[in-house]
Each structure stands twice: as C-alpha cells, then as structure tokens.
Amino acid sequence: MWPPKHAHIGWLSSLALVVLLMSLQMVMVSGIECYVCDTSDTEHPFQCGEWFERYDIPDIQPQNCSSVHGAQFCVKHVGRFEGGIGAKRFCSSKDMGNYCDYVRNKGDRMDYRSCIYTCDTDGCNAAGRLELEWGVAAALLTLTWLLRH
C-alpha cells in the first residue's frame, strides 16, 4: 500500500512543498506589467504622448512583460523619434536609470531634450517622476524666498 503509514506525514509535506513551489513559479512567470506604446504608431498616434490625456486615465492598459526575457522594469522614454517629438513606453530587463539629456542627431540644427524614466512596479511608466518636479519647485520657492529676505 502506497504511501507507507510511517511515511504519510513526509509524503504529504513533500506534496505540499511541490504545490507551493509550483504556485510560486506561476507568480514569478507572470512578471511585471508595463504600458507598451509608441507615438509613431499610425493606428493610435495619440495614445502615447508624454502625458496620458483624460486626467491620466489612458486608453491603453498595462501589458504583461513575460515576452521580454528577464523583464523587471518599465521604461518611459521621451524625446525625438523618427522625425517627431514623442514618447515610447516599454518593458526592459535593464534598469536604464532616470535622467534627461540634450541630444543633437546628425542633420539637426538644434538640441532636443530626451528623458528616460525607469521604474519597477506594475503600470508605473504612465507618467514621469513627480518627485523630481516637486523638488525643482521647492528649490525655486526657497531661492525666491531667500532673495526677497
């Protein structure tokens, strides 16, 4: 008779462990969900601007990033793409950082601001980081106050 009586608890513990590991694997496979869009998309050209319209409730929904090997991050890239200024949102396996820079491509007569925002929670690449903007505002208010006193 299987399992033997003395191995009953060990057998149930092993079965429980296998079920637990399988359920954890399923959670890990689901991965991060990010907004994935591009302003150069001709079917829906206005769904992927720098800011989502309609009070930040976008027409698109975050997508599962399981098709990107090792995806752990969502990225929002704002800059000049294919002749126009716009945004791209995508899944990434690399932390690309958070920074802005001025870029001049070959043939350009001026510099264009290009920004990268990287985050690691579901749907976090909807907008840029507000902390940076609030920090700049606080610094300007402090400077204004100091100059007046």
Curated annotation (Swiss-Prot):
Its main location: membrane. GPI-anchored. It is found in: Cell membrane; Cell junction, Septate junction; Cytoplasm, Cell cortex; Secreted. A lipid is attached at N125 (GPI-anchor amidated asparagine). It comes from the Eukaryota. 'Boudin' is an Anglo-Norman word meaning 'sausage' (specifically blood sausage) or 'entrails'. Mutant larvae exhibit developmental defects resulting in an abnormal tracheal network structure with the dorsal trunk adopting bulging cysts resembling a string of sausages. The C-terminal transmembrane domain, directly involved in membrane association or indirectly through facilitating GPI-anchorage, is required for autonomous activity in cells expressing bou/boudin and non-autonomous activity on remote tissues. This region is required for exit from the endoplasmic reticulum. This is UPAR/Ly6 domain-containing protein bou. The lineage of its organism: Eukaryota, Metazoa, Ecdysozoa, Arthropoda, Hexapoda. The gene is bou.
